[in-house]
Regions:
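Conserved catalytic loops of nucleotide-sugar-dependent glycosyltransferases that act on lipid-linked
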Residues: 66-67, 71, 118-207
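A conserved acidic beta->alpha catalytic loop
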Residues: 36-45, 89
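Conserved donor nucleotide-binding strand/loop of the catalytic core
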Residues: 44-77
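Short, well-formed alpha-helical segments that are part of the catalytic scaffolds
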Residues: 9-28
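Short beta-strand-to-loop acidic/aromatic patch adjacent to the donor-nucleotide binding site
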Residues: 79-90
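Conserved donor NDP-sugar-binding/catalytic core segment of glycosyltransferases
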Residues: 97-120
Length: 207
């Protein structure tokens, strides 16, 4: 399987303690692009030392803005597929192989991860809409796989600060075929570095 066709995209903010190990593990399966969201620590340096392609935001752009830059970088480098992952180790990099098989060998354009943990109330509310309309179990899981043609059709990854869901939901609305696979990893114990405010998703709930 040609690894030059696929990139792992990781947005990172103040993740110096974990990003190096995440990148090293992920690079076993694909090239890694890390976008450092103007972190005040050594996040970018740790990612670069581990072998990632690193770009840095001069100002803090947040989760969606940072992933926008990651998708732009991947497209500019000619990658045909992308897998998004978190920088904190919540997603097991070994799962990349399962995503690659679906994206490349089985030509599934959209692959959605499903977390095993219990979801918060607001996540359940958001998830209920997406589950009922599209049959998606966990739209807020940060590990997703995309054919880059979906990003081109959407004009990028995000325009609405959607907590990482706009591209997936808009693709689903277009009737894009998808598959779901369980994802595992280590759930972080402290607060998420990116402020993923769930109320932002309400912009996507209008049919």
């Amino acid at each position: 399987m040609d690894r030059s066709r696929i990139a792992i995209l990781i947005p990172a903010f103040r993740e110096a303690a974990t990003i190096g190990a995440v990148v090293k593990a992920a690079r076993e399966y694909a090239d890694v692009i890390v976008v450092d969201d103007a972190s005040p620590d050594e996040t970018g340096a740790e990612a670069a030392n581990a072998g990632a392609i690193v770009i840095r935001n001069e100002t803090n752009l947040g989760y969606d803005g940072t992933l926008n830059r990651a998708f732009e970088e991947a497209l500019s480098r000619g990658f045909a597929f992308a897998i998004t992952m978190d920088a904190d180790g919540e997603h097991n990099p070994a799962l990349v192989n399962a995503f690659k098989v679906l994206l490349i060998e089985e030509a599934v354009p959209l692959v959605l991860g499903v977390r095993p943990r219990k979801q918060r109330f607001a996540e359940i509310v958001m998830g209920l809409y997406v589950r009922l309309r599209f049959g998606v179990k966990d739209i807020l899981c940060g590990m997703k796989g995309y054919d880059m043609k979906l990003a081109l059709a959407n004009g990028g990854f995000d325009h609405t600060n959607s907590i990482g869901t706009e591209l997936a939901i808009n693709s689903l609305r277009r009737g894009t075929p998808f598959r779901q696979i369980p994802v595992s990893g280590t759930q972080r114990q402290d607060a998420p570095r990116f402020d993923r405010r769930l109320r932002a998703n309400m912009r996507l709930l209008v049919a």
